[in-house]
């Protein structure tokens, strides 16, 4: 109360109360805690009083700035470390899945290339389903007796209906569509 009268006599309107409180602390009349409480109750801006009483003036988000304004954001690691950890784990899982898929596709392509190579050479390999057909029929009668180079299969797209009658002339057990065969026998 005496402080208010002193300020009123000097014509101050709450502007220099921090200095007055500091003087009283230095002279031993107030403790720091009492001075802070006096400043909060009498001279502080309205939002400090509301924050002090547990009623924040501005809406704050639960992971947000926390006193730096309702739009203020913390640093990414400071915000939610669990979120970033789980995000990194998800990215790593997806990368591993994609690698497994690609390695499976590479194996399948290699199997098909080996199958084509065996069939074009006419070598009877018991693991291929159509090896018996190749060994019985002469290569001139088998539609796959003469094959283009491997690059042909990688560059062309599938056209299974053009010159092929898949029920009669295709080698049994050999899915021609998977080989991207495009030329027919005419």
UniProtKB/Swiss-Prot annotation:
Lineage summary: Viruses, Riboviria, Pararnavirae, Artverviricota, Revtraviricetes
The miscellaneous remark of the record is: The sequence shown is that of isolate R29-127.
Q: Which UniProt keywords apply?
A: Coiled coil, Host cytoplasm, Host nucleus, mRNA transport, Phosphoprotein, RNA-binding, Transport
Per the UniProt entry, what are the Gene Ontology biological process annotations, in alphabetical order? Answer: mRNA transport
Summarize what the UniProt record says about post-translational modification.
Phosphorylated.
Q: Can you quote a single GO CC term? A: host cell nucleolus
* Mutation effect (residue 113 to K): In strain: Isolate R29-Nadin
Quote the protein name from its UniProt record.
Answer: Protein Rev
């Amino acid at each position: 109360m005496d402080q208010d009268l002193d300020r009123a006599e000097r014509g101050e309107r709450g502007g220099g109360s921090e200095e007055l409180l500091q003087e009283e602390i230095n002279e031993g009349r107030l403790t720091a805690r009492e001075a802070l409480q006096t400043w909060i109750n009498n001279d502080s801006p309205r939002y400090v009083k509301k924050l002090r009483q547990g009623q924040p003036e501005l809406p704050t988000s639960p992971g947000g700035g926390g006193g730096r304004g309702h739009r203020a954001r913390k640093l990414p690691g400071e915000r939610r470390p669990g979120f970033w950890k789980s995000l990194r784990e998800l990215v790593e899982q997806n990368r591993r899945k994609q690698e497994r898929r690609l390695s499976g596709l590479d194996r399948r392509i290699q199997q098909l290339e080996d199958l084509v190579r065996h069939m074009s050479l006419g070598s009877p390999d018991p693991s291929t389903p159509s090896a018996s057909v190749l060994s019985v029929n002469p290569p001139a009668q088998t539609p796959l007796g003469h094959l283009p180079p491997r690059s042909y299969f990688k560059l062309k797209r599938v056209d299974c209906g053009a010159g092929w009658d898949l029920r009669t002339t295709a080698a049994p057990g050999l899915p021609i569509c998977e080989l991207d065969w495009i030329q027919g026998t005419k």
